[in-house]
Amino acid sequence: MYDISGWKHVFKLDPNKELSDEHLEMICESGTDAVIVGGSDGVTIDNVLHMLVSIRRYAVPCVLEVSDVEAITPGFDFYYIPSVLNSRKVEWVTGVHHEALKEFGDIMDWDEIFMEGYCVLNPEAKVAQLTDAKCDVTEDDVIAYARLADKLLRLPIFYLEYSGTYGDVELVKNVKAELKQAKLYYGGGISNAEQAEEMAQHADTVVVGNIIYDDIKAALKTVKAVKGE
């Protein structure tokens, strides 16, 4: 079993986006700590299965970030379950989770499942619109969400999601200083190695996503920038 607490760099692949076999191989053989499969829309059991089978040709750990209960399938190493803490809709905080547990609770392997406390900070992002996230928040608000995830709910992961835009480095630094046991994931807007390295100074895990589809070479350079290997 892999230890997620040591992961510094992960790639996130959207099953609803096209990625060539050649580029997938580059991602999986890049030295990244893991590949997360997940997206905000268009996620189906068919494209999740296609992605799973493709990634399983390689040794890299593989995680499904669950956004649709209907797209869950066995075969991943871990399952990340996001709870959008700044959503205005209870369904994205605990609602869909409750429904999933009613249906699948008896057969779930709890050693494979990790809850993520999400704080979505880009109002233009699909995930913000889907979950009706309250993005016009102050630093004090974000710190409070971090404390909620870390100290009250005792979640293993607190995820700052800027999704498509590069985040506030000082805020990331201050959030990290608040966390005692939760790991800080940062995702959003990383388009080059310099940005990845900058965020890696504060976040425990840097998530690289969109740049994979825009500039594969730049995406690959983020691995060494974060891990320093």
Swiss-Prot record:
Coiled-coil segments: none
Its EC number(s): 2.5.1.n9
Binding sites annotated in the UniProt record for Mg(2+): D14, S40
Gene3D superfamilies in the cross-refs: FMN-linked oxidoreductases
GO BP annotation list: glycerophospholipid biosynthetic process
Sequence positions that bind sn-glycerol 1-phosphate: K12, Y159, L160, E161, Y162, S163, G164, G189, G209, N210
Reaction catalyzed: sn-glycerol 1-phosphate + all-trans-heptaprenyl diphosphate = 3-heptaprenyl-sn-glycero-1-phosphate + diphosphate
Classification via InterPro entries: GGGP/HepGP_synthase_I, GGGP/HepGP_synthase_sf, GGGP_HepGP_synthase
HAMAP family: GGGP_HepGP_synthase (MF_00112)
Official protein name in the record: Heptaprenylglyceryl phosphate synthase
Species assigned in the record: Bacillus thuringiensis (strain Al Hakam)
Designated gene of the protein: pcrB
